[in-house]
Every structure is written in structure tokens, then in C-alpha cells.
């Protein structure tokens, strides 16, 4: 399984909760996948500030270390990277032990591959104060155990998780997590936001347009595109004569563009000929005001119009020239054959002159 597949696993059972405008989040995601007969489980850990990945650890790397994934975190000193590498390696070992323990809880054989996922993080409001902390575990794609919003108790997702819940309650593990989330997590988030403010606090507005896709003679699909925006949160809504059509439209998940920005589209099937009655409303914090877009039928380009005008002139000119030639031939015939054929050296000049429209 490649790094991309492992990263996709991170967003499977562990649900990403949206941050509101003006708020920010620090999140760490970890995944361990057992692979019987192929050695130790693979462990991957990534860190995000808002929608931006800034660190990554991969146990399968030639020299496994916590590595930067954003320029603004590269300024951290060697002690930072050594400490986070030690923490990641310790987490990897804990995950390997936990995979074996959970396999026993579920009475599973050693032959199958299993996945353990973990997410931990904090959200702060515009004032920088903690708004919410969270920690979740997932096993084989299902919720296993989660810290409640009070940061003092746990919710078990499955019967087998009750065993872990009792252990953690006895050990006071909720208090340990609460102290981290209310203290260290918030402090590091503030530091990252300050160091990476040029990137993390920016608001890139979307570039939006509508495309037209005929389905049949009676229906077409209108697709509203929003490209190149940051942060991730955006709203696309189709309207018919001003009324929202959210129930009927197809809306894809926001996707990374690969350059630090995001993209999204919303589509709606409409009757052919009624396209101008439908508008797409785009809302994003990078916009001073929402955009309202319609599908614009393609207009003939300047080049196309020039070609058309040129062809018309050519046809008209050709007709005039043909008329002049016929007239001259008739006159020559009337004068008894005084027409003299031009030499080959004169014929090129004659052709240029003949393209001139004669005065009348």
C-alpha cells in the first residue's frame, strides 16, 4: 500500500470537522497497517494546520524521521525534529502492540491485514482560545473509541472497545489528553500560525465559471466550477429564478489542486433552452461579495469574425472581377479582336491589378 492510499485511510473513519471562519485547527493523523509475512506494520503520521500538511513520518522510509512538508516549519531547529522523530517512533511501536491487542479482542487470526487509525487535535477561535479538543480511534474502518467534548469521558463505538474504555478510565488517560489539548496543542498551533501566517492566513478567491454539457435534445447539465481557492471551505449553490436547488444538484467533495489550493464543482440538470434562468452562487472568504454566475453561450471570436468578413469580401470581389472580365471580353469582340495577350512576365502584375475593385 502506497503513501497516497494510507493518506486516504486517514480520512475514512476519522471524520474531519470543519473549522468556522476565523478559527484554526491543529490535527495529527496516524495509521498503522499490519502486513502478515511482510514484516512489521507500516506506520504513517501526518500533521495539519487547517488545510495545510506541514509534517510527515513514514516508517518505510530509508531513514525514518519526522520531515517538513511546508516551508514555514523548516525554520524549526534540530531539537524539534529529533524530539518529534522520537515521538513518532514511539507511536509506531505503540500502534504495533495495539494491533496485536485488538486482534485478540476481536478474536481474529494472524493471517489477515488490519488497520488502526488515530486522530488528535484542537480548534481555536478568532481570539486564540481553545474552542474544542478531540481524540478518536478507529479499527478496520469503524469507530472504536473517542474522547467526548467535555474532554473528561469516553464513548465506545463497539462492544470490544469497552475493554479499552475501562482501562483508560482507570489510568486517568482522559486527564492526560485534556492537559495536552488545552495547553501544548493550543500553544503550538499559535506558534505555527505566526510562523506560517503568509501561507496559513491567506485567502485566495476562487476562479469560477459555468460549463454546458448537452445530455439529450431536452436536457443539459450545467456545471459550476470553483478553482484555485484557499482555505478549503466554500459554498456552491445552484438557483432557479432565485430559489435554491440544493436537493437536485450534484455536489462533489472539495479536492486539493496539488498546488496548495482547492477545487470544487456543483452540477444541475436543466431543461434545454432554460439555461439563463439558472444561476450559480459562489461564497468564499476570499471574495468581497458572493459571485453570481450564468452559463454564457459562446460568442464568435474576433478571429472567426475576421475570417467570415474576409470570405465575404473575397466572394464579392471575385464577382466584381468576373463581371469586369466578361465586360472587357465583350468589348474586345465588338472591336474586332484588338485584345493582346499579356506576356508571362506581365501576368503576375496583371493579377495584382485585377484584384482592385474598379471605380464606377
Swiss-Prot record:
Residues 22-308 are extracellular. Pfam families: C1-set, MHC_I, MHC_I_C. Glycans are attached at residue 107. Residues 340-360 are annotated as: Disordered. SMART domains: IGc1. Residues 112-203 are annotated as: Alpha-2. It is found in: Membrane. Residues 341-354 have a biased composition (Low complexity). Residues 1-21 form the signal peptide. The modification Phosphoserine is found at residues 351, 354. Its main location: membrane. The chain crosses the membrane at residues 309-328. Disulfide bonds join 122-185, 224-280. It is a single-pass type I membrane protein. Residues 296-308 are annotated as: Connecting peptide. The keyword Nucleus does not apply. One of its GO terms (biological process) is immune response. GO terms for molecular function: peptide antigen binding; signaling receptor binding. Residues 206-292 form the Ig-like C1-type domain. Keywords: Disulfide bond, Glycoprotein, Immunity, Membrane, MHC I, Phosphoprotein, Signal, Transmembrane, Transmembrane helix. The keyword Iron does not apply. Belongs to the MHC class I family. Involved in the presentation of foreign antigens to the immune system. This is BOLA class I histocompatibility antigen, alpha chain BL3-6. It comes from Bos taurus. The lineage of its organism: Eukaryota, Metazoa, Chordata, Craniata, Vertebrata.
Amino acid at each position: 500500500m502506497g503513501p497516497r492510499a494510507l493518506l486516504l485511510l486517514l480520512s475514512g473513519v476519522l471524520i474531519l470537522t470543519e473549522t468556522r471562519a476565523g478559527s484554526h485547527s491543529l490535527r495529527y493523523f496516524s495509521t498503522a497497517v499490519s502486513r502478515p509475512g511482510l514484516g512489521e506494520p507500516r506506520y504513517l503520521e501526518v500533521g495539519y494546520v487547517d488545510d495545510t500538511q506541514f509534517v510527515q513520518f513514514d516508517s518505510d522510509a530509508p531513514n525514518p524521521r519526522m520531515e517538513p512538508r511546508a516551508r514555514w516549519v523548516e525554520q524549526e531547529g534540530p531539537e524539534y525534529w529529533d524530539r518529534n522523530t522520537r515521538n513518532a517512533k514511539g507511536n509506531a511501536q505503540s500502534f504495533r502492540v495495539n494491533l496485536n491487542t485488538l486482534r485478540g479482542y476481536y478474536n481474529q487470526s494472524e493471517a489477515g491485514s488490519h488497520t488502526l487509525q488515530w486522530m488528535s487535535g484542537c480548534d481555536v477561535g478568532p481570539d486564540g482560545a481553545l474552542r474544542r479538543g478531540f481524540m478518536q480511534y478507529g479499527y478496520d474502518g469503524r469507530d472504536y473509541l473517542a474522547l467526548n467534548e467535555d474532554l473528561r469521558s469516553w464513548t465506545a463505538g463497539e462492544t470490544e472497545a469497552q475493554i479499552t474504555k475501562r482501562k483508560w478510565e482507570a489510568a486517568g488517560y482522559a486527564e492526560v489528553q485534556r492537559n495536552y489539548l488545552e495547553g501544548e496543542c493550543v500553544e503550538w498551533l499559535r506558534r505555527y500560525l505566526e510562523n506560517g501566517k503568509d501561507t496559513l492566513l491567506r485567502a485566495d478567491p476562487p476562479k469560477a465559471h459555468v460549463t454546458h454539457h448537452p445530455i439529450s435534445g431536452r436536457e443539459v447539465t450545467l456545471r459550476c466550477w470553483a478553482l484555485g481557492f484557499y482555505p478549503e471551505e466554500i459554498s456552491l449553490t445552484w438557483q432557479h429564478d432565485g430559489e435554491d436547488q440544493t436537493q437536485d444538484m450534484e455536489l462533489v467533495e472539495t479536492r486539493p489542486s496539488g498546488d496548495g489550493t482547492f477545487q470544487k464543482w456543483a452540477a444541475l440538470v436543466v431543461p434545454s433552452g432554460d439555461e439563463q434562468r439558472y444561476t450559480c452562487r459562489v461564497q468564499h472568504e476570499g471574495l468581497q461579495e458572493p459571485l453570481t454566475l450564468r452559463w454564457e453561450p459562446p460568442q464568435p471570436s474576433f478571429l472567426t469574425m475576421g475570417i467570415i468578413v474576409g470570405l465575404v469580401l473575397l466572394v464579392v470581389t471575385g464577382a466584381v472581377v468576373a463581371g469586369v472580365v466578361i465586360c472587357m471580353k465583350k468589348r474586345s469582340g465588338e472591336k474586332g479582336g484588338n485584345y493582346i495577350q499579356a506576356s508571362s512576365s506581365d501576368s503576375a502584375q496583371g493579377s495584382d491589378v485585377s484584384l482592385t475593385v474598379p471605380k464606377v
